[in-house]
Amino acid sequence: MVKTVVESKTKTAVLGFDHPFCVIGERINPTGRKKLAAELEAGDFSTVERDALAQVAAGADILDINAGVVYNSNPNPNETEPPLMKKMIELVQGLTDVPLCIDSSVPEALETGLETAEGRPLLNSVTGEEERLEFVLPLVAKYNVPVVAISNDDTGISEDPDVRFAVAKK
């Protein structure tokens, strides 16, 4: 059977049909969380700390890290997200020993996350958009990481399952 292995420095999570259910904690994400976004812009990572510890205590096998916040002081995520991703990953790795899932729509933040993460993280939210694939697939090969793929391309998410399958095969 096919299986996917995700690792931290000390722990391994195996995803596959003949393995137990794997829980991915998704709370470390400022998208739609105005209070967390404001805290991160102010340099306050206390909610990230609490969310990381609470999710592991609740049984998370993997923690998703998303630094997707647009700062009021600098609205360019290409500049703000990579260093924020690095800080968040370093913080979470210092608090927990579970593997990580790197989640971003900013290519530079993905690369920073992959460089910073210890072990073999999971790469989340990989779409079939041509421009994105051109950047992401070399990173996947360079860091030998598994991905969570989303079956949408430059035209969006199709309602036709055959089109979705074609996008997934990319």
Task: Mark where each language-model region is.
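Domain-level signal for soluble alpha/beta catalytic cores
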Residues: M1-K170
